[in-house]
Amino acid sequence: MDYSYDEDLDELCPVCGDKVSGYHYGLLTCESCKGFFKRTVQNNKHYTCTESQSCKIDKTQRKRCPFCRFQKCLTVGMRLEAVRADRMRGGRNKFGPMYKRDRALKQQKKAQIRANGFKLETGPPMGVPPPPPPPPDYMLPPSLHAPEPKALVSGPPSGPLGDFGAPSLPMAVPGPHGPLAGYLYPAFSNRTIKSEYPEPYASPPQQPGPPYSYPEPFSGGPNVPELILQLLQLEPEEDQVRARIVGCLQEPAKSRPDQPAPFSLLCRMADQTFISIVDWARRCMVFKELEVADQMTLLQNCWSELLVLDHIYRQVQYGKEDSILLVTGQEVELSTVAVQAGSLLHSLVLRAQELVLQLHALQLDRQEFVCLKFLILFSLDVKFLNNHSLVKDAQEKANAALLDYTLCHYPHCGDKFQQLLLCLVEVRALSMQAKEYLYHKHLGNEMPRNNLLIEMLQAKQT
């Protein structure tokens, strides 16, 4: 059965930005990407990228790199299982109910638009930056001061942030009773994600500060999907995450009393942020039902994307164009990054800021953020899972919840759902660039000892 869509909504293909022709393999796409995806799957083609696997895919350049185009097809939600293996015309009719539901929502929206007497405006085509947000949201004061984080354990000093903007905090190599012990084994190849405290650690890890507390159930007004409400309850408060991380960074040095380089300190911040993300994942519905092996596989696949999204959303909330906010509450001017950081890190930060501006223009809210975070965790491109069906079901429910939420709460922005999924593509590209940067630093022997991020990189490669 052919599922049509309303052409006067002027939807754009989430892969290349061309005009969509209908529902193909799980979502609305153009005819070109439909044919490309079908040929790739049916012919079992394997592509390679001659660049860094982050090529720009738009209407004019979609044929230049089939590897990146196919990866983008998967990322935005095209379904491998929807392609017929017998090479006959037509896809496997598994998604009829979802298509009908999506079409009904769009028709309802079109009726709303006609009743209100205006035409829905879509976002800019692929490759065209969104219009800048209103200037008042990004006005900078004459001088920047670090905000006072709540509930900090001996809060970070307000003085200069070293030679690169990192707070001047004593650092120690995490001992056996650090936060890592409660989640992972000492060597990552043997680590697991557990709530118990495995040998050789006989006692629970001692973490500074009180345990995380989580928000009261959020009603969110009418029409907030149940999945999003549950995810909001799982999300820890930012000031408590900050307090924990600052507390860990301020532990007295045990084996290295020397003052660490600012880059080393940033790596420690990222380590501690990742530990908080692991804690979130362990409590996530569906994830906690998976076998440990599947949990590890999912985290190995998406750890860098979750870290990037965490940083991006912090900047969206922070709302300043010419500086960034670290997880510790410290502010760093981009001009400082330009002068003190290397060109690779500076370009990475600037690329991240471009995505921040895009999400700010899209009015990304907390409900959408937690849903995007969940979608990244349960990526469908992960191979060798023991329970792939559970992961697939979680992905489909999260997609449906995000679609419902955006259509209901942002009726003036009918393609917000697709725009958010496109932003996930950029999050992935950023994460790949960040991993390349970390590995470059690792090869130069510039990474701190016992760095969890490097262990994650090496585990992915083995």
UniProtKB/Swiss-Prot annotation:
<feature type="region of interest" description="Disordered">
    <location>
        <begin position="117"/>
        <end position="149"/>
    </location>
</feature>
<dbReference type="GO" id="GO:0043565">
    <property type="term" value="F:sequence-specific DNA binding"/>
</dbReference>
<dbReference type="GO" id="GO:0009755">
    <property type="term" value="P:hormone-mediated signaling pathway"/>
</dbReference>
<dbReference type="InterPro" id="IPR035500">
    <property type="entry name" value="NHR-like_dom_sf"/>
</dbReference>
<dbReference type="GO" id="GO:0030238">
    <property type="term" value="P:male sex determination"/>
</dbReference>
<dbReference type="GO" id="GO:0030325">
    <property type="term" value="P:adrenal gland development"/>
</dbReference>
<feature type="zinc finger region" description="NR C4-type">
    <location>
        <begin position="49"/>
        <end position="73"/>
    </location>
</feature>
<dbReference type="GO" id="GO:0006366">
    <property type="term" value="P:transcription by RNA polymerase II"/>
</dbReference>
<dbReference type="InterPro" id="IPR000536">
    <property type="entry name" value="Nucl_hrmn_rcpt_lig-bd"/>
</dbReference>
<dbReference type="GO" id="GO:0003682">
    <property type="term" value="F:chromatin binding"/>
</dbReference>
<dbReference type="GO" id="GO:0090575">
    <property type="term" value="C:RNA polymerase II transcription regulator complex"/>
</dbReference>
<dbReference type="GO" id="GO:0000978">
    <property type="term" value="F:RNA polymerase II cis-regulatory region sequence-specific DNA binding"/>
</dbReference>
<dbReference type="GO" id="GO:0006357">
    <property type="term" value="P:regulation of transcription by RNA polymerase II"/>
</dbReference>
<dbReference type="GO" id="GO:0001553">
    <property type="term" value="P:luteinization"/>
</dbReference>
<feature type="cross-link" description="Glycyl lysine isopeptide (Lys-Gly) (interchain with G-Cter in SUMO)">
    <location>
        <position position="119"/>
    </location>
</feature>
<keyword id="KW-0805">Transcription regulation</keyword>
<feature type="cross-link" description="Glycyl lysine isopeptide (Lys-Gly) (interchain with G-Cter in SUMO)">
    <location>
        <position position="194"/>
    </location>
</feature>
<dbReference type="GO" id="GO:0008270">
    <property type="term" value="F:zinc ion binding"/>
</dbReference>
<dbReference type="GO" id="GO:0060008">
    <property type="term" value="P:Sertoli cell differentiation"/>
</dbReference>
<dbReference type="GO" id="GO:0005654">
    <property type="term" value="C:nucleoplasm"/>
</dbReference>
<keyword id="KW-0675">Receptor</keyword>
<dbReference type="InterPro" id="IPR013088">
    <property type="entry name" value="Znf_NHR/GATA"/>
</dbReference>
<comment type="subunit">
    <text>Binds DNA as a monomer. Part of a complex consisting of SFPQ, NONO and NR5A1. Interacts with NR0B2, NCOA2 and PPARGC1A. Interacts with DGKQ and CDK7. Binds to and activated by HIPK3.</text>
</comment>
<dbReference type="GO" id="GO:0005634">
    <property type="term" value="C:nucleus"/>
</dbReference>
<keyword id="KW-0539">Nucleus</keyword>
<feature type="compositionally biased region" description="Pro residues">
    <location>
        <begin position="126"/>
        <end position="139"/>
    </location>
</feature>
<dbReference type="GO" id="GO:0000977">
    <property type="term" value="F:RNA polymerase II transcription regulatory region sequence-specific DNA binding"/>
</dbReference>
<feature type="modified residue" description="N6-acetyllysine">
    <location>
        <position position="72"/>
    </location>
</feature>
<dbReference type="GO" id="GO:0045893">
    <property type="term" value="P:positive regulation of DNA-templated transcription"/>
</dbReference>
<dbReference type="GO" id="GO:0006355">
    <property type="term" value="P:regulation of DNA-templated transcription"/>
</dbReference>
<dbReference type="GO" id="GO:0010628">
    <property type="term" value="P:positive regulation of gene expression"/>
</dbReference>
<feature type="zinc finger region" description="NR C4-type">
    <location>
        <begin position="13"/>
        <end position="33"/>
    </location>
</feature>
<protein>
    <recommendedName>
        <fullName>Steroidogenic factor 1</fullName>
    </recommendedName>
</protein>
<keyword id="KW-0832">Ubl conjugation</keyword>
<dbReference type="GO" id="GO:0019899">
    <property type="term" value="F:enzyme binding"/>
</dbReference>
<keyword id="KW-0238">DNA-binding</keyword>
<dbReference type="GO" id="GO:0003677">
    <property type="term" value="F:DNA binding"/>
</dbReference>
<dbReference type="InterPro" id="IPR001723">
    <property type="entry name" value="Nuclear_hrmn_rcpt"/>
</dbReference>
<dbReference type="GO" id="GO:0008585">
    <property type="term" value="P:female gonad development"/>
</dbReference>
<dbReference type="GO" id="GO:0000981">
    <property type="term" value="F:DNA-binding transcription factor activity, RNA polymerase II-specific"/>
</dbReference>
<keyword id="KW-0007">Acetylation</keyword>
<dbReference type="GO" id="GO:0033327">
    <property type="term" value="P:Leydig cell differentiation"/>
</dbReference>
